[in-house]
Regions:
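Short hydrophobic beta-strand segments in globular cytosolic domains
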Residues: 40-41, 99, 104-105
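The conserved cystathionine-beta-synthase
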Residues: 9-27, 34, 53, 74-94, ...
Length: 119
């Protein structure tokens, strides 16, 4: 998990502004969308935000649930870093959500693996 990982997360009902603030504060380019018990419902990435803005939606009405990617790629907390890297490469993504039985644990970022010498 990212050393600076403070578990970026929002609720589905959170506004676009709340999503952007969370992503900016946690500095991972992604936030998980969870329910009140921290079950993972989806993720929102910087790319999701850019695509949403390109579509000229009414941003004052957008909620996290409206723009999240459901069923994101995940990995378990006991998986090896090599497996995380394999999932990132195969899916051409830079972040991977860590879950344990559907509960949100955190985010592994490609930069984490780079810093630790796995790449």
């Amino acid at each position: 998990l990212s050393a600076s990982n403070e578990k970026p997360k929002v609720l589905p009902s959170h506004s676009l502004k709340q999503v952007i603030v969370e992503m900016t504060q946690k500095r991972l380019g992604v936030t998980a969308v969870v329910d009140e018990q921290d079950h993972l419902l989806g993720i929102i990435t910087d790319g999701d935000l850019r695509r949403m803005l390109k579509d000229n939606v009414q941003i004052d009405k957008v909620k996290a649930a409206d723009i999240m990617t459901v069923k994101p790629k995940t990995i378990g907390p006991d998986e090896l870093a090599a497996e995380a890297l394999n999932v990132l490469r195969q899916n051409e993504i830079t972040q991977l959500v860590v879950t344990d039985n559907g509960l949100y644990i955190g985010v592994i970022h490609l930069h984490d693996l780079l810093k630790e010498g796995f790449i």
